[in-house]
Amino acid sequence: MPKAKGKTRRQKFGYNVNRKRLNRNARRKAAPRIECSHIRHAWDQTKSVRQNLAEMGLAMDPNRAVPLLKRKVKAMEVDVEERPKELVRKPYVLNDLEAEASLPEKKGNTLSRDLIDYVRYMVENHGENYKAMARDEKNYYQDTPKQIRNKINVYKRFYPAEWQAFTDSLQKNKMEVE
C-alpha cells in the first residue's frame, strides 16, 4: 500500500523549553500516593485536603485541633464560645484507623535461616561443649567458643518455644539411643 502524500518533517528538539522546570512542575502537580489504604479509599479528588480530612474526622493542623488555652483571659471565661463541632461524614475511616492502631505490633526482628540451622547443628552434635563447637568443620566463620555461646543465647532469646521443643526432642532421642 502506498504511503500517504504530504509533508513528513522530522521532529526538532525544543531548545527553548526549560526541562528542569517542566519536570519539577509535573512532579508537583502529580498527586502523591496515599499510603494508608483506609484514607485512600475514602479520599475525594474533587475536594481539598482540609475538606477530605474534616469529613473523615481527622485534623489537618494538630495545633488547631487542640488549641492551647491562654491563661491571661480568666475574667472573660463566661463569654467564651466553643467552636461548633465539624460534621464527620465518614466516621468509618476513623474507626478503622483506631482499630488498626490498637492491634499489637508484629515482631520484625528474626534470625536468618542459616544461623538457626548452624545453632541447631552445633547443639545436636556437641551439646554444651563450646570448645568442640569451635573446632567443628562446620564452623565456617571460625567463631570462638564465646561467640558460639552468644549465638546460641540469641537463638534461645528469639525463639524460646522452638528452643524448648528442640531440647526436648534431643532428650527424647538421647533416651531412645541409651
From Swiss-Prot:
Q: Which UniProt keywords apply?
A: Acetylation, Isopeptide bond, Nucleus, Phosphoprotein, Ubl conjugation
Task: State the superkingdom.
Answer: Eukaryota
* GO BP annotations listed: ribosomal large subunit biogenesis
GO CC terms: nucleolus
Residues modified as N6-acetyllysine are 90
Enumerate the subcellular locations listed in this protein's record, separating them with semicolons.
Answer: Nucleus, Nucleolus
Residues the record lists as Phosphothreonine modifications: 8, 144
- Crosslink Glycyl lysine isopeptide (Lys-Gly) (interchain with G-Cter in SUMO2) sits at which residues? 74
Could you tell me which InterPro entries the record lists for this protein? Ribosome_biogenesis_Nop16
| Similarity-based family | Belongs to the NOP16 family.
Recorded hits in PANTHER family, A to Z, give:
HSPC111 PROTEIN-RELATED, NUCLEOLAR PROTEIN 16
Protein name per its UniProtKB record: Nucleolar protein 16
Q: Which organism is it from?
A: Bos taurus
Q: Which gene encodes it?
A: NOP16
